[in-house]
UniProtKB/Swiss-Prot annotation:
Stretches of the chain forming a coiled coil according to its record: none
Entry's family note: Belongs to the G-protein coupled receptor 1 family.
Transmembrane segments: 47-67, 87-107, 121-141, 161-181, 206-226, 319-339, 351-371
Encoding gene, per UniProt annotation: GPR75
Lineage: Eukaryota, Metazoa, Chordata, Craniata, Vertebrata
Protein name: Probable G-protein coupled receptor 75
Length: 540
């Protein structure tokens, strides 16, 4: 297609006319360059629109359905209704408006497109774009309010949230309808470029003001959230101030110690001002108490408090990274269209470059709608993992690689050599393969085993696990480090040790390290016999 034909039909966008004194070969060269640039723009926009249609439709569809499927999640707060509204707007943009825009790209003017199609595209694109952006701005203001602690105990009621959503829909589509009615039928089927002069300019100016205000609100809000979280993370990195005072209750007080212990508190601010460390300390205490009557030492509570502080610091750091990603995505995806719209409002004559800029700006706005479910939803990490898994699976299919297993031998030699070794030889591998029953072995560093053959009853493991040095197997094959305090096994009773207590030292954070020892049925049989010998377990 000829790009000059686009510009002749588009208002405020005139082709680059060549003076009559120049030769015809320079004119043809310039037209050829314009055709090349326009073709590159079409190819780039088409590729991005294909990605938007696939990933954006998938992500928004999953997020939208999760609010109606009881097997997924439900509203944690009433304001989660805004996430539902955002997913619906973005789903319509990615699944309907983006394919319509792809159809518009490959036609020179609106004269070759049906009027009903062009009217529908005008209304849906301009309406859903500003509606999605307003919803993102409202979510940003709500999160900023929660982080700054403005009335943290008072959440928005469900009727108020619904009324706010209806107000956003009314304002957005009123402006979109006015802009659609003021379009010219003889120009390009683009929402903003086809506005006629006069009242069309006034509506376009109002649309630009609304668009710019929403972008500014989102950017400033998440910048303030990132600064607040960064300050909280810096404060938590300082050594905690431990004070003991049993006479009066203090904020951020720890779990009271039974049997004469003193409550422990820390002068550390929480992420939200209505949040303290009681819940975190409760999570930490559950992993190390065998019974409710067991005493908790002050050193153990102190270690739990330090672990809670480290967890909050890590969460603040991840939240800061998320805020930076949100700000960059908003600026990169919204600024090109905003600049082109401002240029259309301020100048009566456009240019070929401005027209290409506007096409690319609309594509980036649609691309932002495809990114929203991977950023704003509570299951965004799961969606990203699924997409990465699909990409890896496709890559393996292209390269025809065999799927690798998670267990790999770490010792010298191949598996056949290790399999043929006798039981008294030391292989120093991550796992041992032998047809003969082994009497001296433990689970490996690649993860705890939850199979039926490797499980021991809780009574046996509780009464006959000893801590001592082993002379046959290196200690590095017996320890499994975990770098998260969350339980990574299906059942806490089977995975957490029952005889290990936190050490009175700050050198090791025991909430981040778990020791898993499992034996096989051979150990169960040895326990039943009178001549059984217990396997010594190394101490930390």
């Amino acid at each position: 297609m000829n790009s000059t034909g686009h510009l002749q039909d588009a208002p405020n966008a005139t082709s680059l006319h060549v003076p009559h004194s120049q030769e015809g070969n320079s004119t043809s060269l310039q037209e050829g360059l314009q055709d090349l640039i326009h073709t590159a723009t079409l190819v780039t926009c088409t590729f991005l629109l294909a990605v938007i249609f696939c990933l954006g439709s998938y992500g928004n569809f999953i997020v939208f359905l999760s609010f109606f499927d009881p097997a997924f999640r439900k509203f944690r707060t009433n304001f989660d209704f805004m996430i539902l509204n955002l997913s619906f707007c973005d789903l319509f943009i990615c699944g309907v408006t983006a394919p319509m825009f792809t159809f518009v790209l490959f036609f020179s003017s609106a004269s070759s497109i049906p009027d009903a199609f062009c009217f529908t595209f005008h209304l849906t694109s301009s309406g859903f774009i500003i509606m999605s952006l307003k919803t993102v701005a409202v979510i940003a203001l709500h999160r900023l309010r929660m982080v700054l602690g403005k009335q943290p105990n008072r959440t928005a009621s469900f009727p108020c949230t619904v009324l706010l959503t209806l107000l956003l829909w009314a304002t957005s589509f009123t402006l979109a309808t006015l802009a659609t009615l003021k379009t010219s039928k003889s120009h390009l089927c683009l929402p903003m470029s086809s506005l006629i002069a006069g009242k069309g300019k006034a509506i376009l100016s109002l649309y630009v003001v609304d668009f710019t205000f929403c972008v500014a609100v989102v950017s400033v809000s998440y910048i303030m959230i990132a600064q607040t979280l960064r300050k909280n993370a810096q404060v938590r990195k300082c050594p905690p101030v431990i004070t003991v005072d049993a006479s009066r209750p203090q904020p951020f007080m720890g779990v009271p110690v039974q049997g004469g212990g003193d409550p422990i508190q820390c002068a550390m601010p929480a992420l939200y001002r209505n949040q303290n460390y009681n819940k975190l300390q409760h999570v930490q205490t559950r992993g190390y108490t065998k019974s409710p009557n067991q005493l908790v030492t002050p050193a153990a509570s102190r270690l739990q408090l330090v672990s809670a502080i480290n967890l909050s610091t890590a969460k603040d750091s991840k939240a800061v990274v998320t805020c930076v990603i949100i700000v960059l995505s908003v600026l990169v995806c919204c600024l090109p269209l905003g600049i082109s719209l401002v240029q259309v409002v301020l100048s009566s004559n456009g240019s070929f470059i401005l027209y290409q800029f506007e096409l690319f700006g609309f594509t980036l706005i649609f691309f932002k709608s495809g990114l929203n479910p991977f950023i704003y939803s509570r299951n965004s990490a799961g969606l990203r993992r699924k997409v990465l898994w699909c990409l890896q699976y496709i890559g393996l299919g292209f390269f025809c690689c065999k799927q690798k297993t998670r267990l790999r031998a770490m010792g010298k030699g191949n598996l056949e050599v290790n399999r043929n070794k006798s039981s008294h030889h030391e292989t120093n591998s991550a796992y041992m393969l032998s047809p003969k029953p082994q009497k001296k072995f433990v689970d490996q560093a690649c993860g705890p085993s939850h199979s039926k053959e490797s499980m021991v009853s809780p009574k046996i493991s509780a009464g006959h696990q000893h801590c001592g040095q082993s002379s046959s197997t290196p200690i590095n094959t017996r320890i499994e480090p975990y770098y998260s305090i969350y339980n990574s096994s299906p059942s806490q009773e089977e995975s957490s040790p029952c005889n290990l207590q936190p050490v009175n030292s700050f050198g090791f954070a025991n909430s981040y390290i778990a020791m898993h020892y499992h034996t096989t049925n051979d150990l169960v049989q040895e326990y039943d016999s009178t001549s059984a010998k217990q396997i010594p377990v190394p101490s930390v």
